From Swiss-Prot:
Key words, A-Z: DNA damage, DNA recombination, DNA repair, DNA-binding
Composition bias type Low complexity, residue spans: 362-371
Quaternary data: Homodimer. Interacts with LigD.
Superkingdom of source: Bacteria
Keyword hit for Iron-sulfur: no
Cited function: With LigD forms a non-homologous end joining (NHEJ) DNA repair enzyme, which repairs dsDNA breaks with reduced fidelity. Binds linear dsDNA with 5'- and 3'- overhangs but not closed circular dsDNA nor ssDNA. Recruits and stimulates the ligase activity of LigD.
GO biological process, one term: DNA recombination
Entry-linked CDD domains: KU_like
Protein name: Non-homologous end joining protein Ku
GO MF annotation list: double-stranded DNA binding
Regions of compositional bias (Polar residues) in chain numbering: 283-292, 311-320
SMART domains: Ku78 (SM00559)
Family named by the database record: Belongs to the prokaryotic Ku family.
């Protein structure tokens, strides 16, 4: 970076040679004045108001205008004879906490660079001293023909100089305050706090000059002969007189904007995931319905076993036997009936529930009746044995 001023930092008895370079740059758009008739650029010439003659740069000097309008010529030799100790020196006058500096005083910013190898050690000493003390240095320096006030602080590994306005150059704020005694309610303060929390923080590096970019795009479009569509006016939502309503609308708009930004970041994933989720739910729902139908069919089969013509007592004992004796054929038939019924129900969704129940009932009845017959036959054998034993006893 090109230096704009060379001098030294006066730090007590220590003198640190430095170079002053601009820390900022101006990116604003500047327009030229042209003649509308032919597009020619308009130039300004220096003309003496007394003889109305054009004056060149070599014939131009400077003067101090007195209160009554009198011009008092001042030459460069006159200025060079002034006792100005800060002409080539940044003179540190005090070290103060950073919060002692009013941001209203902040002006242009510069970087201070050590000028030469011998300046590196004292430069580093001052930088580290400012870091450890958490203070800033207040200094005076002369630049572009006037003495200025400045503040030295550490930025990374560099000492920066901020130009400051003199205290008498800051206007008092009382004239800008609202007139009258205005009361703010707690509800309004709460909504304002909510709005500030909703807006959140911002990455300063992401901020840019939208107007400058729009002007550059406009100039490029006109240079290529393209037409630029007019910008659509923003919807401000109309005039809101009620402060509470305005705050509520602001909070709502901030939340909507934040939600839209969050949804825009992963909208593609949401579009891919949703159909799969619905398909999975439908599949699980279908299987659940099939299982429910199979369970209802099995219950129907169990209820039907109570209506067999064998009798109430036999039917209950047969039903009990079929449930308890897993190795018997009737239990196996019931398991097969349950599985086949579940498979048929899952494969054929349009089959009526009553038809499935009838088929299962028939199979369940057959198995239960067979078990009942076996129980009845075994019961008959037991009765015969009891009769023969009675005959022997009577004999």
């Amino acid at each position: 970076m090109r230096s704009i001023w060379n001098g030294a930092i006066s730090f007590g008895l220590v003198s640190i040679p430095i170079k002053l370079v601009n820390a900022t740059e101006n990116h604003s758009i500047s327009f030229r004045q042209i003649h509308l008739a032919d597009g020619g650029r308009i130039r300004y010439r220096k003309v003496c108001e007394l003889d109305e003659q054009e004056v060149s740069g070599s014939e131009t000097g400077k003067a101090y205008e007195d209160a009554d309008g009198t011009m008092i010529p001042i030459t460069d030799e006159d200025l060079a004879q002034l006792p100005l100790p800060t002409a080539k020196t940044i003179e540190i006058v005090a070290f103060v906490p950073a919060d002692r500096i009013d941001p209203l005083q902040m002006d242009a910013a510069y970087y201070l660079s050590a000028n030469g190898v011998p300046a590196a050690k004292p430069y580093t000493l001052l930088r580290e001293a400012l870091k450890r003390s958490n203070r800033v240095a207040v200094a005076k320096y002369a630049l572009r023909g006037r003495e200025r006030l400045g503040m030295l602080r550490v930025v990374g590994e560099v000492i920066a100089l901020h130009g400051l306005l003199w205290p008498d150059e800051i206007r008092p704020p009382e004239d800008a305050a609202p007139d009258g005694d205005i009361t703010v309610r707690d509800a309004e303060l709460d909504l304002a706090d909510t709005l500030m929390s909703t807006l959140g923080e911002v990455d300063m590096d992401s901020l840019h000059d939208d107007y400058r970019e729009a002007v550059e795009e406009l100039a490029a479009a006109k240079a290529s002969g393209e037409s630029v569509p007019p910008a659509e006016p923003e919807d401000t939502g109309g005039e809101v007189i009620d402060l509470i309503a305005a705050l509520e609308n602001s909070v709502r708009a901030a939340r909507t904007s934040r939600d839209d930004e969050g949804a825009g970041g992963d909208g593609g994933d949401m579009a891919d995931v949703h159909p799969i989720g619905r398909g999975a739910k439908a599949s699980s729902k279908t299987s659940g319905q099939s299982s429910g139908k199979a369970a209802r069919t099995t219950k129907t089969a169990r209820r039907t076993t109570h209506r067999t013509p064998t009798g109430k007592t036999v039917t209950r004992s047969g039903d009990s036997t079929a449930e308890k004796s897993a190795p018997k054929s009737s239990g196996a038939k019931k398991s097969t009936a349950k599985k086949s019924t579940a498979k048929k129900t899952a494969a054929q969704k349009t089959t009526a529930r009553k038809t499935t129940a009838k088929k299962t009932t028939a199979k369940g009845t057959t198995g239960t009746t067979a078990a009942a017959k076996k129980r009845t036959s075994s019961g008959g054998g037991t009765a015969k044995k009891s009769a023969s034993s009675r005959k022997r006893t009577s004999a």
